[in-house]
Design a protein with these regions (language model features):
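Surface-exposed, charge/polar-rich loops and edge strands
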Residues: 1-158
């Protein structure tokens, strides 16, 4: 299971849905993240079904926000959004999200805290921007939050 999805118990998902939050499935086969700045993330297998692609496009077109749960979800959606719209897509993604590439399919991200200079941190910067990300990490250090796969999660919502 992707680590960002661990807190999503049946009870939490039920509560979110009861409050009108829409959830959309994506199939992910996650890899092991490398903390090294010079190492790109490994290719990861994914599948974005047509219903999910349509829902993401509809939510964004009507002014809603798409919040990804985990960095692999971002990679999958961004891979499926090469035309500016998210389309049904499946395969392996090697897409690297950076401040230079930006994001087209997500507005926010629930994720763990990632190591400095990692490719995951570049993705977080692309989504949240440097000021918000700096503030988030300073607070995490000050409060003693735990890092990465078995650590604490945060919501990045610029």
């Amino acid at each position: 299971m992707p680590s960002a999805g661990r807190p999503f118990t049946t009870a939490l998902v039920t509560e979110l849905v009861s409050r009108g939050i829409l959830l959309a499935p994506i199939t992910l086969h996650t890899g092991v993240a490398s903390p090294e700045a010079h190492e790109p993330p490994y290719a990861e297998r994914y599948a974005v079904p047509g219903t999910t692609a349509s829902l993401v496009d509809h939510v964004r077109a009507t002014g809603g926000r798409v919040i990804a749960v985990g960095t692999t979800v971002v990679r999958a959606l961004e891979t499926a959004a090469t035309s500016g719209r998210v389309v049904a897509s499946a395969g392996f993604t090697e897409h690297l999200v950076t401040p230079d590439t930006g994001v087209r399919a997500v507005d926010g991200l629930i994720t763990g805290l990632h190591e400095p200079r990692s490719t995951h941190l570049m993705m977080l910067t692309a989504i949240a921007g440097t000021p918000l990300l700096t503030q988030t990490y300073e607070a995490a250090l000050e409060e003693g939050y735990l890092w990465h796969e078995f650590g604490d999660l945060n919501l990045l919502l610029p």
